[in-house]
């Protein structure tokens, strides 16, 4: 069993994976003085028995590293996985300065790229098992990525240098994170990234139209659930034809991955679903239903 949690952190992203091995992974953060204490205490509690904790930064955007200095102060980051960049900002926040400090640290930083390997991210040895995390993008030699990196390093948008992170529970569900990749960029790299059927996909750019996952990707991913993050409703794309969970309504979303099933829990007790199977799961509060992991392509969805 493993746990994947998506925090409701306003217009930003923050996740963790409590692996079924000796690993704990945090993906992005968006903390402030009001929320940091409770969030960090949960991270410390959930990771306390894990030998390896890593932080994966998808890209250098304020709402994906906000409050990282608060996290690092209370829960020191020893393994910082990041796309290599020299991003610049017209206004440097304390969080950006701290991000740069971690990014450029010769000991703590590990620069991720398509197909990279590392103990114990995706390699196993006699000490501990793999986390099951793989990096599908960026291809640092791809010309479109190089253009996006150049723009980012010159003070432009960092969205299209986002890492694509893919997690697989052995014999169970798969989960994908896309950072803030934009639709046009995803279309450009369709033939240069390996995509396979994925159980749960976190929509790019918090579900905004600007990060709508193109059909060319959705056909390969064939997701059972698309999670739409927090953004103003007028900017969201609701992915007609697919089952979705919207963080604006659900609040924190906790996914319990058990064998070939995923049980879903939310922090909003008023949020209900009738299109998920009732397995009677009760590990956490506010259970809303479950899915059984598909292994064959269906290319059929249901509006939710």
Regions found by a protein language model. Name each.
Residues 5-7, 25, 56, 81, ...:
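Hydrophobic/aromatic beta-strand patches that form the interior of the parallel beta-sheet core
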Residues 11, 33-34, 60-65, 86-90, ...:
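Active-site environment of divalent metal-dependent phosphoester hydrolases
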Residues 1-50, 114-197, 251-261, 266-304:
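Core dinuclear metal-dependent hydrolase active-site scaffold
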Residues 92-129:
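Conserved glycine-bearing catalytic or ligand-binding loops at nucleotide- and phosphate-handling centers
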Residues 97, 190-263:
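Long, structured stretches of catalytic cores involved in phosphate-ester chemistry, encompassing
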Residues 25, 33-87, 192-208, 219-226:
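Active-site metal-binding motif and surrounding structural segment of the metallo-beta-lactamase
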Residues 28-30, 57-60, 83-85, 114-116, ...:
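Active-site-proximal beta-strand/loop segments in catalytic clefts of secreted hydrolases
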Residues 65-74, 90-100, 213-218, 237-240:
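Metal-dependent catalytic neighborhoods of phosphoester/phosphodiester hydrolases
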């Amino acid at each position: 069993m493993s746990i994947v949690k998506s925090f409701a952190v306003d217009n930003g992203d923050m996740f963790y994976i409590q692996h079924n091995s000796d690993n704990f992974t945090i993906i992005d953060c968006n903390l402030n003085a009001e929320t940091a204490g409770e969030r960090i205490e949960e991270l410390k509690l959930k990771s306390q028995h894990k030998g390896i904790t890593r932080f994966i930064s998808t890209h250098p955007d304020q709402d994906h590293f906000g409050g990282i200095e608060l996290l690092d102060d209370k829960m020191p980051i020893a393994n910082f996985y990041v796309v290599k960049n020299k991003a610049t900002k017209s206004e440097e926040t304390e969080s950006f300065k701290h991000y740069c400090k971690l990014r450029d640290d010769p000991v703590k930083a590990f620069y991720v790229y398509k197909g990279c390997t590392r103990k114990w991210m995706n390699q196993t040895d006699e000490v501990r098992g793999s986390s099951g995390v793989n990096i599908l993008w960026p291809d640092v030699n791809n010309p479109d990525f190089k253009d996006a990196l150049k723009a980012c390093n010159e003070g432009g948008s960092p969205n299209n240098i986002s890492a694509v992170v893919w997690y697989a529970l052995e014999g169970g569900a798969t989960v994908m994170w896309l950072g803030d990749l934009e639709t046009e960029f995803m279309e450009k790299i369709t033939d240069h990234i390996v995509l396979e059927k994925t159980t749960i996909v976190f929509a790019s750019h918090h579900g905004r139209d600007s990060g709508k996952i193109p059909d060319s990707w959705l056909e390969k991913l064939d997701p059972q659930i698309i999670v739409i993050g927090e953004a103003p409703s007028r900017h969201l794309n609701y992915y007609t034809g697919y089952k979705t969970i919207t963080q604006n309504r659900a609040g924190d979303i906790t996914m319990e991955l058990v064998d070939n099933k995923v049980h879903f829990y939310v922090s909003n007790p008023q949020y209900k679903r009738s299109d998920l199977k009732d397995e009677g799961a009760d590990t956490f509060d506010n259970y809303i239903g479950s899915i059984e992991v598909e292994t064959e392509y269906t290319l059929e969805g249901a509006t939710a």
